[in-house]
Amino acid sequence: MATTRLKTLYQETIIPKLTQQFQYTNVHQVPKLVKITVNRGLGEAAQNAKSLEASLTEIATITGQKPVVTRAKKAIAGFKIRQGMPVGIMVTLRGERMYAFFDRLISLSLPRIRDFRGISPKSFDGRGNYTLGVREQLIFPEIEYDSIDQIRGLDISIITTAKNDEEGRALLKEFGMPFRDQ
């Protein structure tokens, strides 16, 4: 498999820039992407097998990897959930697939969001990881408008080795993440 554009960019330009910016003494101190998780909670669709299948195929099409069905650990009567019922689906992307998905997300999908002015720089978790909520799956070019039955969102978490939010933000900004000005 050929090296993706973002991996080459990371190795050739991002590592030297961040080393200089944060005065790292070792190349292994530079933050890097570890994994990207794509998650969708099913909510009301948990009782509907057809909607679960549609979600599975959509996430598989978007990420290029088969999703795992997450199940309820215990019953919650208020939400009409029994133990073992499907409550969501998720995919963990690493390596080349992660870089390929991240490249498509930054360059193709995010600009397709209606009234897009950049993503919020406040969604970091304090440890340099970023989580992004997408309201509709139509922003991904792999999804055809006619093939969906209902508009559903998904969560994308970008996990890095950064020690704090400042390092994580610098890393993602160098990758080309379109952050909104504060």
Swiss-Prot record:
Q: Which Gene3D superfamilies match?
A: 3.30.1440.10
This protein's source sits in the domain of life called Bacteria
Can the keyword tRNA-binding be found in this entry's annotation?
yes
| Keywords of this entry | Ribonucleoprotein, Ribosomal protein, RNA-binding, rRNA-binding, tRNA-binding
Gene of this entry: rplE
Q: How does the record describe its quaternary structure? A: Part of the 50S ribosomal subunit; part of the 5S rRNA/L5/L18/L25 subcomplex. Contacts the 5S rRNA and the P site tRNA. Forms a bridge to the 30S subunit in the 70S ribosome.
What is the name of this protein?
Large ribosomal subunit protein uL5
Recall the taxonomic lineage recorded for the source organism.
Bacteria, Bacillati, Cyanobacteriota, Cyanophyceae, Nostocales
This chain's function reads: This is one of the proteins that bind and probably mediate the attachment of the 5S RNA into the large ribosomal subunit, where it forms part of the central protuberance. In the 70S ribosome it contacts protein S13 of the 30S subunit (bridge B1b), connecting the 2 subunits; this bridge is implicated in subunit movement. Contacts the P site tRNA; the 5S rRNA and some of its associated proteins might help stabilize positioning of ribosome-bound tRNAs.
- Per the similarity annotation, which family is this? Belongs to the universal ribosomal protein uL5 family.
Keyword tRNA-binding belongs to the record: yes
Q: Give the UniProt entry's GO cellular component terms.
A: ribonucleoprotein complex; ribosome
Family matches, as Pfam families: Ribosomal_L5, Ribosomal_L5_C
Question: What organism does the record attribute this protein to?
Answer: Trichormus variabilis (strain ATCC 29413 / PCC 7937)
Q: Name one GO molecular function term.
A: tRNA binding
NCBIfam families reported in the protein's UniProt record: PRK00010.1
Q: Which InterPro entries match?
A: Ribosomal_uL5, Ribosomal_uL5_bac-type, Ribosomal_uL5_C, Ribosomal_uL5_CS, Ribosomal_uL5_dom_sf, Ribosomal_uL5_N
What GO biological process, any one, is recorded here?
translation
